[in-house]
Regions:
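Metal-dependent catalytic neighborhoods of phosphoester/phosphodiester hydrolases
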Residues: 75-83, 107, 279-289
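General small-molecule cofactor/ligand-binding pocket signal
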Residues: 12, 95, 120-125, 138-140, ...
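Conserved beta-strand hairpin/beta-sheet module of binuclear metal-dependent hydrolase folds
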Residues: 2-56, 91, 151-153, 160, ...
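Active-site metal-binding motif and surrounding structural segment of the metallo-beta-lactamase
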Residues: 45-95, 123
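Metal-dependent phosphodiesterase/nuclease catalytic metal-binding core
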Residues: 2-3, 31, 125-271, 282-287, ...
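A short helix->loop->beta-strand "cap" motif at the edges of active sites that frequently abuts
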Residues: 88-92, 264-268, 295
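Active-site neighborhood of divalent metal-dependent phosphoester bond hydrolases
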Residues: 85-123, 277
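Active-site neighborhood of phospho(di)ester-bond hydrolases with catalytic His/Asp-centered motifs
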Residues: 41-44, 61-68, 97, 211-216, ...
Length: 312
């Protein structure tokens, strides 16, 4: 795949509950299919079963942990063991804030004595980035009780639209040469003239942006990261009634999540990480967020799948 973005960007919510599982919601986990790459963001207890239920597959390339509270990472123990039992040989990289190396090594050793595949653990700080195939995942420091990160998946810019009439006017041969120009290569036209991509392509098109807040109080770093994002996934553990509890535990209310989306001018907001008290009825959270943010809002549920369309 070229560095000109991706075609597929599909999200599957594996777990949407805060702190403890419920009948309807598992602990935190999000699978992101970025063309051929499969990424996990957090891996709460039971995530591997959710991956089986919702058909994401186990061919995970990287796991990004927002922080190391138990409900966000203890599922890695069983997941690693299952990968080993399945005969995996390709490398796996685990990313997260400090103390990722210590905690993840301990977790992995609880599950297996020896791994049949290479495992790398990388600690990330605010501003760090990881390059993928057609995208970059950036780390953003947030405000939680422990060291915690939000993540920004930014698709690479895509070439501008191909001007067919202009290409024909420049005597570009139809077929493979059209594709070469769209991939950023120059070609020789039938009249012998050299045609550059800029001669037949419109303005560069921005890539899609996905922002995953993890556990956090509302903070300026997330607002900045989510500026005009295609999708902001923000935690909404509490309602207005639990504002003091949100402050104590360094979580967000649904209203605060809506306010973050509004300040960021995000194009879409999905609320997740809900307290068990809203397991059966999350309408209160949705209504409070809507009082702050006028854009599209949804409450995530386990198994929910979202595909982000390409930007024009």
């Amino acid at each position: 795949m070229s560095a000109a973005g991706m075609s597929l960007l599909r999200l599957t919510f594996l777990g949407t509950s805060a702190a403890q599982p419920t009948i309807h919601r598992n602990l935190s986990g999000l699978a992101v299919k970025a063309d051929t790459d499969l990424l996990l963001f957090d891996c709460g207890e039971g995530s591997q079963r959710q991956m089986i239920r919702f058909g994401t597959g186990f061919s995970v390339d990287s796991v990004f942990f927002t922080h190391f509270h138990a409900d966000h990472y203890l599922g890695i123990i069983g997941f690693i063991r299952t990968l080993g039992m399945g005969g995996r040989t390709q490398p796996l990289t685990l990313y997260g804030p400090h103390p990722a190396k210590r905690l993840l090594r301990q977790a992995v050793h609880l599950g297996v004595d020896a791994l049949p595949f290479p495992l790398e653990i990388v600690e990330l700080q605010h501003g760090a980035s990881v390059k993928g195939h057609g995208y970059t995942v950036g780390a953003v420091q947030v405000d939680h009780r422990v060291s915690a990160l939000a993540y920004v998946l930014q698709e690479d810019e895509r070439p501008g639209r191909f001007n067919l009439e202009r290409a024909r006017a420049l005597f570009v041969r139809e077929g493979p040469d059209f594709g070469r120009l769209q991939r950023g290569e120059s070609v020789s036209a039938s009249n012998g003239q050299l045609v550059q991509p800029a001669d037949v392509l419109g303005p560069v098109r921005p890539g899609r942006r996905l922002v995953i807040s993890g556990d956090t109080r509302p903070c300026v770093t997330v607002v900045a990261a989510a500026r005009e994002a295609d999708l902001l996934i923000h935690e909404a553990t509490f309602s207005d009634d639990e504002q003091e509890r949100a402050l104590e535990t360094r979580h967000s209310t649904a209203r605060e999540a809506g306010r973050v989306a509004k300040e960021a001018s995000a194009r879409r907001l999905i609320l997740t990480h809900l307290s068990s008290r809203y397991d059966l009825d999350s309408s209160k959270l949705l209504n409070e967020a809507r009082e702050e943010y006028a854009g599209p809002i949804e409450i995530a549920h386990d198994g929910m799948t979202v595909e982000l369309p390409l930007r024009d």
